[in-house]
């Protein structure tokens, strides 16, 4: 489908992070001592993507630039919408939520909340979460799939881990309370209020 990971040989430092984090055992070490990402077996979860310090993994579905662009565009659109705080609501848009219901529920009620859909929160890095603050939001709410509802193995684990990493960094600035992670099933959107 072209949505999975692609190894960018010229950027790879052979750190083996992709091997460590992939729940599907897609990356392997070849006899020549190189990494091989078996594209035909990749599930497209994106867990390896933010784990690569050299950006040596290309991603067909949604890459770093696209994630940051979605975030920046949504924040720019929301600026000036109201005088109150702006909260970026980053949610899994892969299949956990009915976006129509989420938008309808928020319409008029929460003018300072902006929706940014990402196909699985595991694709986010701590830097992506921190960049939202750099772009001017007052807070970030990450909404992920509840345990065992994620389309991908370990998706909720890696999403939570990256939120925790960003919160640790924000704590040094006394801003940890501005980033929250919640798990809400598509059936439980009334919890969002």
Stretches with model-predicted labels:
Residues 49, 60-193:
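Iron-sulfur-associated redox domains of electron-transfer enzymes in respiratory
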Residues 7:
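Catalytic cores of glycan-processing enzymes that make or break glycosidic bonds
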Residues 1, 17-43, 47-66, 70:
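Iron-sulfur cluster-binding cysteine motifs and their immediate structural context
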Residues 1-3, 29, 107-113:
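Gly-rich Lys/Arg/Thr-decorated short loops/hinges at beta-loop-alpha junctions or inter-strand turns
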């Amino acid at each position: 489908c072209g949505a999975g990971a692609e190894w960018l040989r010229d950027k790879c430092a052979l750190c083996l992070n992709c091997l460590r984090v992939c729940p599907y055992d897609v990356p392997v070490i070849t006899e020549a001592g190189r990494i091989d990402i078996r594209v035909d077996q990749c599930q497209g979860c994106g867990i390896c993507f933010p784990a690569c310090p050299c950006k040596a993994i290309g991603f067909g579905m949604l890459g770093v630039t696209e994630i940051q662009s979605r975030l920046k565009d949504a924040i720019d659109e929301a600026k000036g919408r109201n005088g109150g705080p702006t909260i970026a609501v980053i949610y899994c848009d892969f299949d956990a939520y009915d976006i129509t219901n989420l938008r309808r529920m928020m319409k008029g009620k929460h003018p300072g909340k902006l929706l940014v859909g990402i196909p699985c929160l595991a694709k986010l890095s701590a830097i992506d979460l921190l960049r939202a603050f750099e772009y001017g939001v007052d807070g970030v709410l990450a909404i992920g799939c509840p345990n065992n509802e994620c389309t991908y193995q370990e998706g909720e684990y890696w999403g939570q881990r990256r939120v925790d990493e960003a919160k640790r960094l924000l704590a040094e600035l006394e801003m940890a309370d501005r980033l929250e992670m919640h798990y809400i099933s598509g059936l439980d959107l009334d919890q969002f209020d």
